[in-house]
A protein has these predicted regions:
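Charged, terminal alpha-helix-loop-beta segments
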Residues: 1-191
């Protein structure tokens, strides 16, 4: 009986190996390079900086359109990309998009880093210090999975005030599909 079980396992293992050989080669460069959250933010930053030959921030506009389609609030409809200042790791904010009439704070948690005490609140306060009204500040949280939400203490006094100007865009459910479906078609084959 043991012999039959071992023979079955050997045959099954061989079948799995043959089926794996039929699959296309899979390589995730980001994982292989052991890129951390800062490097991940840098990649997103570079994408958002892209301007087409007409000077439009095509990828940033695409992301804003994606957010407008998927947000639980119409508040995001007030965002109009004009002449954004896009920065990375300024004032400890992972990504920061500031335009004349709005500011967007991106908090990247792709590797499940824990929120610091009052982290989002500090970023909101910093943005207010740059003369943005709270009603014109938006928060985009970027965790690996949509079930990951900011810790309550990260919000400080702002959680309720920002619930309509906050969106959780998980890398798995939102960012990757947006890149595949919305960004990839924008890329010129010469770029």
């Amino acid at each position: 009986e043991w012999y039959n079980t071992l023979s079955f396992c050997d045959g099954f293992s061989l079948s799995i190996a043959k089926e794996k050989q039929k699959l296309p080669y899979h390589l995730n460069i980001i994982d292989e390079l052991h890129i951390n959250e800062n490097a991940n933010s840098r990649i997103l930053y570079k994408l958002l900086l892209y301007k087409n030959i007409e000077g439009k921030y095509e990828i940033l506009e695409s992301l804003i359109d994606y957010i407008k389609r998927n947000a639980h609030s119409s508040e995001f409809n007030n965002i109009q990309v004009k002449k954004p200042c896009i920065t990375q790791e300024i004032k400890r904010i992972d990504l920061w998009v500031r335009d004349k009439d709005y500011a967007i704070i991106f908090e990247n948690k792709i590797y499940n880093a824990t929120d610091q005490d009052a982290q989002i609140a500090r970023y909101i306060d910093t943005t207010i210090d740059y003369n943005y009204k709270p009603e014109n500040i938006f928060i985009i949280y970027l965790p690996p999975f949509s079930s990951n939400e900011p810790e309550l203490n990260s919000w400080g006094k702002y959680k309720k005030d920002f619930e309509k100007r906050y969106i959780n865009l998980s890398f798995r459910n939102n960012v990757l599909p947006w890149l595949e479906n919305d960004v990839l078609p924008l890329i010129n084959s010469n770029d």
